[in-house]
Amino acid sequence: ILLDEIIQPLNCDPNYIKRVIKKYIARDAYNNTSAVCTDTTLLERFDTSRVICPEDRALATGKALNCKDLRYNRIPLDSKGHPHPSFTGVPLYHDTILRSPLVLDTIALWPVRDIYCNIAVTYEDIDLGRIGCVQKYMRMWSIREWWCNGERVRTCIPLIEIVDREAPYVHCPYPI
């Protein structure tokens, strides 16, 4: 049973952003209680070098989006009518958990569920226009860590191309 939780910000600590102190007791079926147990956790600072940027969704990578999929609502759109990040990819945080066996974990950084770790993740699309049958967007992701009266920013800029891959088809039911 959690009795108390104290969150202490560690301003300007080079390694940690917060100390979380939790006090617990255990209670059995006969209502007997244990002594108070205190658990202290230090939250490490966000390491921007562990960010994995989304891949380009472009012809060059073989991962361009098909305009037919947009037309038939097979690709979700964001509030501005652009392909939604849940479909095109979001920045990930790659972490290594040291134990046996070694565990590699990736965590989606968007949408940010809270700012408990002093980070914010946002994106903005820049419309590069249409060239021939290719519509291009440059998606600018900003991953910000606030620390010690300043901030560190990591930027990811994947390219998103929407391509018309199919020629028109004309069906002539009668001979001309």
What is the predicted function of each stretch?
Residues I1-I176:
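Proline-threonine-serine-rich low-complexity tracts
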